[in-house]
Amino acid sequence: MSDRIVVRDMEFYAYHGVFEAEREIGQRFEVDVELHLDLRSAAQADDIDQSINYVDVYTAIKEIVEEQEFRLIESLAEAIAEVLLSAYDLEAVVVRVRKPSVPIGGIVGEVEVEITRTPADLRSPANEEL
């Protein structure tokens, strides 16, 4: 069984992208996260210390998006997942990163990457190569 805390539509201005102009000019990025965990004890105790503080989640994501540099939003999503899985006792985390303005030579509303990770993914051999 899995409960969820969902934080949607976080917006940041950052300098990620494949193209040099994206990294120089910057652009808007949007992030959603779903934190899968058992929330029964927090609900029964009505105590934030038994849950996850949304401010802390937002702050951690803001630091990653605004202070680190990535060429791919896939890499940005992975970094967010790793930090959240390391910081909290989660069953899983879903991370969505959207890039509303994509320089691909056509009209596109946005591009989004969605990843799902579990604590086992932190210990996987593929992750050790990153």
Where are these regions (language model features)?
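N-terminal, polar/charged subdomain of small-to-medium soluble alpha/beta proteins
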Residues: 1-130
